[in-house]
Amino acid sequence: MFLMNAPPVVALQSRWEAFGQPRSFCLPDCFSEAKEDGSRASVSARVQMLISTLQRDEAALGMGHERLTQRGQRAERSRDTRLAPKPAVCKEQPEFPARGLVANCSALEKDEAGRRSPLELDSDSDDSVDRDIEEAIQEYLKARGGASEPMSQGAPSIPEPAHSSTLPIPCPSQLTPGSGSVPVGASEDQGSTSPASMSSEDSFEQSIRAEIEQFLNEKRQHENPKCDGFVDKKSDPNNSPARLRGNRETSARAALMGTCKEFIFRKPPRLTKMSTQQRNFQPKPTTEPETPVSTKLTAHRPEAAQSRGGVRRSMPARRSKRIRSSAPVHQASDSSSDDGIEEAIQLYQLEKTRKEASGDPPLRGQLKEESPGSAQPNALPEAHRRPPSKKKLAVPKVIDTTQGVLHPDPLSRLLTDSRASLPPGHAAAKSEAVCQASRLADTSTELMCAEAILDISKTILPAPMEGSDRPPSRNPLFCPQPMPPRSEGDSSNIDSDDSIEQEIRTFLALKAQVGSPQPAQGPLSSPGPSGQPGIPKVPFAKTLDLPLVCKRKRRGGGGSTTMPKKIREGRESTQDADHIQGKAQPGHDGWDPLGHNKITETPGGEAEAKEQPVISRTVGLSDTHLPQGALGKATEKESSEDKSSSLDSDEDLDMAIKDLLRSKRKFKKRCRDPRASCKKVRFGSTETRCGEKPSNLPGDWKDHRQQALRSCLPKCRGDNKDGPGRSPGSSVAEKAKMGGTGGEDATPAFLLRRKSPEGALPSTDTGASGHPPSASSPTSEDSAVDSDDSIELEIRRFLAEKAKESIRNTEPQGGPAKPEMPCRKDPTLGLQPGVCTRSQKARGTPQLAEGRRGPERARTQATGLLSQSGKGTLRAEQTARLTTALGRSEPALPKNTCRNSSAKASPPSRKSAHVHKDHSPQGSQTATAESVFGQLPSCAKVGAEAGSAGGTFHLNYGSQNLLTPNPGSQADLVLPWSDFAHQSRLSSPWVLNSGQGTVWTGVFRGEKEKGATSQAGAPPSLSSGPRKGLPFLSTQLFHFGKNVSWGGKQTSLFSPNLGLPLQAPAFSAFRETQPGHNPVFGSPHLLMKDSGNWPSRKAQGTLRQQDRRNSASEDKVLDLRYRHRVDREPQDQETLGSDASEFSDTSMEDGGSATVSSKGLKL
């Protein structure tokens, strides 16, 4: 298209002439300025033509609608005239280079003009003529803006400024009294600068000026009402970009027009306060004086220059221009888009006339322009709108006060009306159809604007955070209303770009209206606050988004539910922070931010979000009322993210995630503190309790679980949605706390927080039933809110039933009661009443928790389950994946699945024995030391107590990485805990004590240590030292799924992603070495971990199973406090060999708990 380097004489000339007449392309040609002489002559003729056309236009524009028609006529006439004098026009075009408009118009250009003469001439001449006309119109608008701006601002101007704030950028156009002058100013800038470069054409410019002045004078008289809404907008979308480029070139008027330029051109990144304000204020007076001269001077040259530089972009710009019927004048500058421009102008004029007739010319005109060109005007206007939000947020005093005061309600009404009333459906449809094409470009701009607005709202809105609860509830109320008009009218256009911006605006406007209609509108800048200035703009986009999002959320959870996920996250984080300390759910609430954050980020998070409001209510709406600003900010962010999730959601999510992570960290500390404050079960004290409650645990656990389940299930219903992502930790923490381990729960919950995405929800026995469902559904179905909700409900029911079963089972035997279900492990979970197994995986994992306390167990189990359900496959059933529990949920309660259950037959006796306090004190203390796993140690204790629960394994380790396999690994890892459990030592729950913060960093070396006598009471328990001993069943081998890092011995048996519980038979090595005692595995191996984490064993953690002989008191839980390294023969290691590697795999995978080296379990 650009024959920049083509020789002056091109054979294509004649061909192009034939094709040129269609004027389908404005070809910016860069040619040598060889034929400027003839072009100047043609320029004078062209000037005469322009004058005549301008005069005609003046007459027509004076008529009102004729202006639009004449625009097309002018374009046509200019085209016709140019087409007729193509040679002259070619000369003119070469002259343009001389003038600086077409610096490269040369003989080649002439030739091309001859070839493409219609095209070339049309493009340049059309552009210049159209742009001259446009500039004249703009100048007129400036003058009119100066004179009629007070009028339009007085009556229409309020809507207009409101528009500029709400529908903002139309705002440039609606600001056209100020902002309208901006496009004019922009063109003037070009004019002012262009004249400098075109100084050679003074006479031409002067003639143009005279014509333009006359024309503008007439237009000012006739088009004061029309041009404001019409020309301003049109000028803004089209002229703004094209002339902004010119403006960029021109530094003159930088103060006034520079601001306008920035506003128009930079509006996506930063529609600065100055740009809006200056546009609104300075451009009016300054632009008008400048307009007649500089615009006229510039009229052709800047337009020609733009026709070159701008025409190239005008190819895309034409689309936007056409799409933006709002820019018909500027579109006219694009010769190829003249027809479309004419049509758009006519339609726009009709619309404008209707608007004027309706009394809302500026508002409706702009609204309609936005709605018809919603995508493009939105791209540009919305880019403006969003920055105006920023501007309003930042400088709400000037603009927002004038624009935003009346706007929130009128804006929503106008937006609705404009969307609904868009009488020029053809224009709207046309612009919408084209907008879809321009939206692609606009989307990026709008996204940038939305991001900037979100950032600004983040910084600015925090002030109004206190009213956050209110705006969310209002939002739901208002969202549906604004949403139908916007969604219906602009569904196609708004969906990607407008929806975000409009919904934000709607949300802000609604928030402003509902919160403090007047303050939100005028003071929106201050109280509604900084975010509120943009409310007029943002609220509608927000409302649109909120209707979609809020509807889902409202259905899931109440007024606060309507709050965007991130808002809820931030609010809940605050709530969690506040409540974590003050409530039994500190960990739970603390988890809400994290798990909820993750979920919030994902569609599935909405399920959480739904319930999170419930939690917020539970936690306290005082937190929910995080500053309106926070909600508005979060809501704005969230709603925009919801629709622009693919666009700017990543950035917003990153920011939100970072914020949430920060809050989570704070919550972690807070949760730890609440754990400390909530002595529910301090691990130090829990240690003893574990021993003390061995036999009592079942009853107590049952009671706690039942209570916790009752309390947690309702909360889970409210929280599960929060919990889905965060429930693993939050549910466990909450439930455990409710069960009395609340203080400790925060740690598992915190640990789970990182696991929560995995959906390891089957955490606590008590709350397991409720939370696992939520965890499983959100984790597995983050993207499906509905499915999450239904799944969560189903899972909750199932878990509730299962918890009851578990309680029953746990009551009788604490674990061995149901060995029949190896995979389901639910009966085994019975051992751990809180087996909130995800529907499939984490059935039995919670058993472990039983041992401690209902709550504590619940937390431990929840942690274990969470870790296991990290993939949402809670192999809890396969509690066999102790490794998952170890790696993932510190409470590595493998809840010996079926086998655990079967093994539990003997364990019942051991239960009490294991439960003996030995392991718990140290392990619990260590766990307590580890804030995150503090609860886990108690779980370990619980596990000891849970000895009754049936050889459940309690991983107590302060550090999360203790045997924390990847969520997936955990899910995949299904260890034949039942097999391990079958072994008497399995019956005794082994507590993984990393309580001192020692993590199973090294390897689980399943070393058959026949001399594991040091572990007097618990042969099955791992003792690598007080901290080092892992309470693994001697026979249990943990394959953590994918990574077989332990000792590098990974049995194919446990393929990284086996995902199915390893059963005793699966552990061939284990079975090989089964001693007489161990049905599944040979001599019981003391799983010991030499890990730097374990105080006594800072070396690699090794899983060592004590000999059955050594573990003479298999019934007794290994005294983790006195975890002794039990040296066993390598035989056992060999036996566990490959399986051990699997175990190490998962724990290695766990990332956080991956401290476990990829050393294979050596049993």
From Swiss-Prot:
InterPro entries linked to this entry: PPP1R26, PPP1R26_N
Keyword Nucleus listed: yes
Main location: nucleus
Amino acid composition bias (Low complexity), ranges on this chain: 515-535, 766-780, 901-910
Biased composition (Basic residues): 315-324, 672-682
Keyword set, alphabetical order: Nucleus, Phosphoprotein, Protein phosphatase inhibitor
Location of this chain's protein in the cell: Nucleus, Nucleolus
Region ranges (Disordered): 65-91, 144-253, 266-393, 463-496, 514-653, 672-929, 1073-1163
Residues that bear Phosphoserine: 1111
PANTHER family for this protein: PROTEIN PHOSPHATASE 1 REGULATORY SUBUNIT 26 (PTHR15724:SF0)
Subunit structure and binding partners: Interacts with UTP20 and PPP1CA.
Protein name: Protein phosphatase 1 regulatory subunit 26
Organism: Mus musculus
